[in-house]
Swiss-Prot record:
Keyword set, alphabetical order: Cytoplasm, Lipid biosynthesis, Lipid metabolism, NAD, NADP, Nucleotide-binding, Oxidoreductase, Phospholipid biosynthesis, Phospholipid metabolism
A Pfam cross-reference name: NAD_Gly3P_dh_N
Binding site for sn-glycerol 3-phosphate: 105, 134, 136, 189, 242, 252-254
Active site annotation, chain numbering: 189 (proton acceptor)
Protein name (database record): Glycerol-3-phosphate dehydrogenase [NAD(P)+]
Family: Belongs to the NAD-dependent glycerol-3-phosphate dehydrogenase family.
Catalytic activity: sn-glycerol 3-phosphate + NAD(+) = dihydroxyacetone phosphate + NADH + H(+); sn-glycerol 3-phosphate + NADP(+) = dihydroxyacetone phosphate + NADPH + H(+)
Lineage of source species: Bacteria, Pseudomonadati, Pseudomonadota, Gammaproteobacteria, Legionellales
Species of the source: Legionella pneumophila (strain Paris)
Subcellular compartments: Cytoplasm
Gene that encodes the chain: gpsA
Alphabetized SUPFAM superfamilies for the sequence: 6-phosphogluconate dehydrogenase C-terminal domain-like, NAD(P)-binding Rossmann-fold domains
Length: 329
């Protein structure tokens, strides 16, 4: 593939890591942040000390705070902002020429819509889109360690171009057309990672964590099937792959947040200690609302949502789950 200009909108750890990957394989990459001071610091230090310290930028990775210019200069636009900022970004930018891809995992907090629905409302239902998801920690991608991702799209030509853009010796990209399933996996797994963190914070051990992952996967799958997703998506990289990674490794900020809650650290202090957006906290209420609308039981997600809203404490949430009526698996 000829080398392209990429606009990466969002300079958190994940957006920065993917920007570094794209720049390392030869694409000119514009890394946008809304904060001019953050941009100046990245330009001065040729790295992102706030979110991905210790990993230098390639020369062709250029920080910027000019959102419109980044989009206008780019051959391809990728969004990597938190889910609560996604709608604001797509409403500000001009329509990208090729299509729009995103790394964001979550749903819109205001409308409870999938991010693909927001984009369809803004740019049209036939506008090419792609969602990139899967088991991937930022530092490992930035360090060129082997990673496999799922790329779901509504347009085969655009999907092929995005595949060529990302695919390299260190990143293997699998293709999907299940936009609903891939997006739901990315949103729900963060809530389940909080649950696993809480369980470990309470000292409950490996058995409890395995049960949460397994029953959490069942919840995720039920919700997806009710919305038209395919079951095999939940058994793939975007589903069980990302779920296991996020629930078991302390690089996951959602899991670390749960660990703190399990150790009785107050929610505001836990968020402060994490220092970055905890998507599972922001998306728990939205996922529960979507589940209620679709008449799907998601008891683990419901207990995490209740805990986050101060209705139950960690031990009580566990007791509520363990005392549920017996049922077939």
């Amino acid at each position: 593939m000829n080398k392209k200009t990429i606009a990466m909108l969002g300079a958190g750890s994940w957006g920065t890591a993917v920007a570094i990957h794209l720049a390392k394989i030869g694409h000119k990459t514009l890394l946008w942040s809304h904060n001019p001071q953050h941009v100046a610091l990245m330009a001065e230090q040729h790295s992102n000390p706030a979110y991905l310290p210790g990993i230098p930028f390639p020369e062709n990775l250029i920080p910027s705070d000019d959102l419109i210019e980044c989009v206008q200069l780019a051959d391809y636009v990728i969004i990597a902002v938190p889910s609560h900022a996604f709608a604001e970004i797509i409403n500000k930018i001009p329509k990208p020429t090729q299509g729009l891809a995103w790394l964001t995992k979550g749903v819109d907090p205001a409308s409870h819509q999938l991010l693909s629905q927001l984009v369809a409302s803004r740019f049209g239902v036939d506008f090419p889109i792609a969602v990139i998801s899967g088991p991937s920690f930022a530092k490992e991608v930035a360090r060129f360690l082997p990673t496999a991702l799922t790329l779901a799209s509504n347009n085969t030509n655009y999907q092929k171009k995005m595949h060529q853009l990302f695919h390299h010796d260190n990143i293997r990209v699998y293709l999907s057309d299940d936009l609903i399933g891939v997006q739901l996996c990315g949103a729900v797994k963060n809530i389940l990672a909080i649950a696993c963190g809480i369980s470990d914070g309470l000292g409950y051990g490996a058995n409890a964590k395995a049960a949460l992952i397994t029953r959490g996967l069942a919840e995720m799958t039920r919700l997806g099937l009710s919305m038209g997703a395919r079951q095999d998506t939940f058994l793939g990289l975007a589903g069980v792959g990302d779920l296991v990674l996020t629930c078991t490794d302390d690089q996951s900020r959602n899991r670390r947040f749960g660990l703190l809650l399990g150790r009785e650290v107050p929610i505001p202090e836990a968020e402060h200690q994490i220092g970055q957006v905890v998507e599972g906290k922001h998306n728990a209420a939205q996922i529960c609302a979507i589940a209620n609308k679709n008449k799907v039981e998601m008891p683990i997600c419901e207990q995490i949502n209740a805990l986050l809203h101060g209705i139950v404490h960690a031990q009580q949430a566990v007791n509520n789950l363990m005392s549920r009526p017996a049922k077939e698996e």
